[in-house]
Regions:
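Helix-rich alpha-solenoid scaffolding regions
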Residues: 1-54
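Long, contiguous, well-structured interaction cores
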Residues: 57-203
Length: 203
């Protein structure tokens, strides 16, 4: 049980770390080497209450038509889904889920919000103040409500939209490995005694 909790914590931490890096790259690409005030202004727009601009590839302010485009296609959210796929690649069929990675998308979305909030002063402050470490954690306690809230939108995603999201992930990582770099998927020997072991129910 303890190991399962540890693995879940490591999974969340990896997604949060990869998204934090992707947010930094996105802000530098978008704002250039501009002053912290420019980054702060941009982050404020992305996180503006009632807008959730950070969830979109193109916001209402960037679009020529003044509309939002590309829900869940922001590059840092795609980076989070990429992390999920890399960590779960090569799992035995019995452990894989046939549906779309809704939970991973929810985690990626709120991890992006968390990472952007670290830039509200125009520079990344996450991890800077050790006395504030508990309030910066990417934990269920701090981010559970946000994760459940964003799931409401995720449950409405159509199969066609999921294909767009997964295509964007494939483009973001040049080669999506079918197995993790350090391991290969195991084959099954159905003639092995371990596979043939069986005991019928006794009276």
């Amino acid at each position: 049980m303890l190991r399962a909790i540890q693995r879940a914590t490591e999974y969340r931490a990896r997604i949060a770390k990869d998204i934090k890096n992707a947010v930094r790259v996105h802000l530098i690409d978008t704002c250039g080497d501009s002053s912290p005030s420019s980054i702060q202004e941009y982050v404020d727009l992305l996180l503006e209450n009632g807008k959730a601009r950070y969830m979109w590839k193109t916001t209402d302010l960037e679009s020529l038509t003044g509309t939002f485009e590309g829900l869940f296609l922001a590059p840092y959210i795609i980076a989070g889904i990429s992390s999920h796929l890399e960590m779960t690649a090569g799992l035995p069929d019995e452990l894989t889920v046939s549906t779309y990675p809704q939970g991973a998308l929810a985690l990626a979305t709120v991890a992006a919000e968390r990472a952007l909030k670290g830039w509200v002063n125009g520079r990344d402050t996450i991890g800077e103040d050790l006395s504030n470490k508990k309030n910066e954690e990417f934990s269920e306690t701090l981010w559970g409500t946000a994760t459940k809230t964003v799931m409401t939108s995720i449950k409405k995603i159509s199969a066609k939209k999921w294909q767009k999201i997964l295509s964007a992930v494939t483009e973001a990582i040049p080669q999506v490995h079918s197995t993790p770099k350090l391991c290969k998927a195991a084959s099954v020997d159905t003639e092995d005694a371990r596979a043939l072991a069986y005991e019928p129910n006794s009276d």
